[in-house]
Amino acid sequence: MLSIRNLQIEYDSKVIVRNLTLQVADGEVVCLRGESGCGKTSILRAVLGYIDYSGTIELDSAVMNERTTAGLRQQIAYVPQEFVMPFDTVDEMIHSVMDLRANSLQPCSKDLLMTAWSQLALDLSLYDKQARELSGGQRQRIMLSIAGMLRKRLLLVDEPTSALDADTTRLVAQYIHRLAHEQHMPVLAVSHSDTFAQQCNNIIDVP
């Protein structure tokens, strides 16, 4: 379970998140919804320990602080909205993120990955593409499929459907729900999409 109590985040002496309290149970998907600039992504970054905040953040009853954050961060999968692609090929991207030493994915692992791609409406031919040829939506869905393979204790997802149509948005929401349920994992997602938010167990409107 992810528990956040009285979270407050300031930037340049301005409070951007004030007294946020929420819980995300194992197997549950909670959506943070709000206008651009209201602090949704900052909440995810606070959970990761990347920015300063006041309040309490706990993962499975372990309080995040200066002593524990590095270890707890290893238990979190994070799919950002935008990220640098320092990889030439999709295959290289997958192996780098999953930290695999072999030259290719094991057959069982690749089968699982391809199943995830099908569920995310990703063309299987993308596996052999150059990374620069991918759209933003394709890159993010590939990262989401990898996050599912990592089997972490918590999944954080930032705007996973920002470049997608309504039908694909529903498929992504269903995939995230499946991950949460099958891996008994809490998921905290950021989205401005009502279509995505309506598929979640709970919606937290961030003012």
What are the language-model segments listed below?
Residues R33-E35:
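The feature captures the beta-strand-to-loop junction immediately N-terminal to the Walker
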Residues V47-L48:
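Helix-to-loop junction immediately C-terminal to a conserved catalytic motif
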Residues D52-N65, L72:
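Conserved ABC transporter NBD signature motif
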Residues E82, D88-S104:
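Q-loop/switch helix immediately C-terminal to the Walker
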Residues C108-L126:
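Conserved ABC ATPase "signature" region
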Residues Q130-L134, Q138:
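Conserved ABC ATPase signature
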Residues L155-E159:
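Catalytic Walker B motif of ABC-type/P-loop ATPase nucleotide-binding domains
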